[in-house]
Amino acid sequence: MTRAAERGQGATGWGLRGALMAVALLSVLNAVGTVFVLYQWRELSAALRALEAQHGQEQREDSALRAFLAELSRAPARVPEPPQDPMSAARNKRSHGGEPASHIRAESQDMMMMMTYSMVPIRVMIDLCNSTQGICLTGPPGPPGPPGAGGLPGHNGSDGQPGLQGPKGEKGAVGKRGKMGLPGATGNPGEKGEKGDAGELGLPGNEGPPGQKGDKGDKGDVSNDVLLTGAKGDQGPPGPPGPPGPPGPPGSRRAKGPRQPNSFTNQCPGETCVIPNDDTLVGRADEKVNERHSPQTEPMITSIGNPAQVLKVKETFGTWLRESANRSDDRIWVTEHFSGIMVKEFEDLPALLNSSFTLLHLPHYFHGCGHAVYNNSLYYHKGGSNTIVRFEFGKETPQTLKLEDALYFDRKYLFANSKTYFNIAVDEKGLWIIYASSVDGSSILVAQLDERTFSVLRHINTTYPKSKAGNAFIAQGILYVTDTKDTRVTFAFDLLRGKQINANFGLRMSQSVLAMLSYNMRDQHLYSWEDGHLMLYPVHFSSTAPSQR
């Protein structure tokens, strides 16, 4: 305990010593600062007294000079006397004996003024020269001063005269091809060219209307030959047996009993048949139906080949079309979006790839992605109506056809994936329209058209619900329907026989939006518009008879 107490007392003593030393150091610094401040104060006081003395001396000199100048300004001005002759001057010298004294005073005054001026500050001299006139004489001009700082830039001057044209420059690089301009004026007809080679044999045309009855011909000459009727001869021997006849149509199956075949009838269940306006078409339509119901089998699609991409555009919806009938017509037509009034016409495939086109203005707005081109005419759905428009290229007046009881409003699309109410199709058997009925609102129907009169020959009800369909196309008189994802063909219907047939094959692997799907009989390819990708699919047919359900 004693050692701990000693250690505590020692620590306390060292702390007190340190505090005392700090206080002493502060006191010393304070004293030194006080002495330094007093020294500075003394120096500043001496400088202030010197400045006050100098200022007082300047004031005294200034007041003395001002008094002298005031006295000088009150002195009378000396007027110069006219020159005198020598005799007068002599008399004046004799009569004015005291003049030399005044001359001496003037010299002394001048000397005093010079001495006074030499003691005057420059500022006072400047004030004196400015306030009085005649005392300060103007000296010679001084040397020129240094150049001043540059001034602000002036205003822009007016344009000068155009210079001479320079030499022609070097030829630049070839620029990008510009857009096609407006059509120019019609030029003069050129010279008649040589006759070209004969083209390929085209498809047979449609049967023309019967001609007018001709005039009665002239009466023929009287024949001089006399034909006598002979007696009836004996019966000849029997001939050899003839070749076997063609097989008859298949009979109906009656084993299943309850199930009825889905055959076509003229009643059009759930739909009103359109009767052609021309009475002569009734017999002709029956002939065509009987013709196409012949026992000859139509080829059926068995598979779809690998696709080839033609072009990529930015629009999700659209159609690209080629002429189906005329093989020599290489034009391509493109509609962008599922609604519009403009059509792009390309001269050929290279023009499509180079985006070189001509804009065509349609007479009515189109809707959907189910258009078709057939015999130089564009077939499309007139937006907001149940009307199909036939617009012949190069003509201004279109033709229209109404489909009664067809869905065309309230977004109850035939194919929701492509925003389409009507899908026009062209194949080897003619012109078709795929649509949905507004009576039941669920089944897919097909109307067969007479292309010559632009009228409906008959309506075919496939009884297949449109809710299960993604898109559809027609080839060789058979309707093919895809699933809702547009990846497989899951339904087929023979439109010529009015019966469903077995079909199930893959279409594509992509899950993109399939806005357009159309068969072209010209090259037997499927044309599609898939989320801006313009694609081509080769079609493979089978010649065997399709199995029916």
Curated annotation (Swiss-Prot):
Keyword terms of this UniProt record: Cell membrane, Cell projection, Collagen, Developmental protein, Differentiation, Extracellular matrix, Glycoprotein, Membrane, Neurogenesis, Repeat, Secreted, Signal-anchor, Transmembrane, Transmembrane helix
Site residues, Cleavage: R94, S95, N277, D278
The record's account of how the chain is modified after translation: N-glycosylated.
Composition bias type Basic and acidic residues, residue spans: 213-222
Membrane topology of this protein: Single-pass type II membrane protein
Extracellular side: 39-549
Annotated localization: Cell membrane; Cell projection, Axon
GO molecular function, one term: protein binding involved in heterotypic cell-cell adhesion
Note on domains (UniProt): The olfactomedin-like domain mediates NFASC/neurofascin and NRCAM binding.
Entry protein name: Gliomedin
Source organism per UniProt: Rattus norvegicus
Originating gene: Gldn
